[in-house]
């Protein structure tokens, strides 16, 4: 007698969010390391529902809490590895312990650091961008931008040899990234930026950039510790600036940002406590 064994593996992966892309994002964690367990659990929960999940950070992760500061960011990177981060950009505080330390951290990290406008001796210091492809073939291009304010906020000795493009040079760099990622066949383009929306950052803010750079689907912001409520004050009723969804999620993991891309291409942003 033949036994009929039903293959349930395909059914088990089918969840309510099958075909969805979920981007979980954090920014300005500043050493609030107890929250990383929550982030990891959220990633697993969405994956259990069948979503393709990317976990990103928009900078300032390796300074703040003494545990993280004493280790010069190493503790943060270890915990981010465990939480399953897929890509990050740099914040100005990543340079607090110097460029060489940051290079060492990038080697410890199991995730790429993307920062298209950060140059070392004239060449891109880390990675400009990273492309992720979902099982169904959707391509998501992610590029990073660091605040040019790092040049004045960091001690000169810590950033010797480092150039951070700002203003028009940064805008041109961003547009070149968009054009390159589109040429590579990306269906969605995300900018992971540590720019912020503060008045004192005028000329280098995410909003300034989005008014001149076209083709970014989602801009995940940091630097100004802005919540979604703060962001709503600088966007249109759809949460967009010049057609780009702008989002940010405060500081110290008080909440985690959730960007959802539906199978039909609808992109929405919210935050999870």
Where are these regions (language model features)?
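Short, small-residue-biased leader/transition segments that mark boundaries at the very start
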Residues: 1-5
């Amino acid at each position: 007698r033949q036994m009929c064994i039903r293959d349930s593996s395909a059914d088990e992966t089918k969840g309510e969010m099958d075909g969805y892309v979920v981007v979980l994002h954090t920014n300005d964690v500043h050493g609030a390391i107890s929250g990383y367990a929550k982030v990891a659990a959220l990633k697993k929960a969405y994956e259990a529902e069948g979503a393709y999940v990317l976990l990103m950070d928009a900078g300032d992760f390796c300074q703040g809490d003494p545990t993280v500061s004493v280790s010069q960011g190493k503790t943060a990177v270890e915990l981010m590895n465990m939480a399953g981060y897929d890509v990050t950009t740099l914040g100005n505080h990543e340079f607090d312990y110097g460029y060489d330390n940051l290079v060492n951290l990038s080697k410890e990290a199991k995730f790429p650091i993307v920062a298209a406008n950060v140059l070392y001796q004239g060449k891109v210091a880390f990675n400009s961008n990273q492309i992720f492809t979902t099982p169904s073939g959707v391509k998501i291009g992610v590029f990073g931008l660091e605040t040019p304010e790092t040049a004045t906020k960091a001690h000169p000795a810590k950033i010797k040899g480092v150039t951070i493009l700002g203003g028009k040079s940064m805008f041109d760099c961003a547009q070149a990234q968009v054009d390159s990622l589109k040429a590579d066949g990306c269906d969605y383009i995300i900018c992971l930026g540590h720019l912020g929306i503060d008045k004192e950052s005028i000329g280098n803010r995410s909003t300034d950039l989005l008014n001149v750079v076209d083709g970014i689907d989602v801009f995940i912001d940091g630097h100004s510790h802005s919540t979604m409520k703060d962001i709503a004050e600088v966007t249109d009723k759809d949460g967009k600036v010049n057609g780009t969804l702008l989002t940010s999620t405060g500081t110290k993991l008080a909440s985690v940002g959730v960007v959802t891309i539906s199978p039909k291409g609808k992109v929405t942003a919210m935050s999870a406590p």
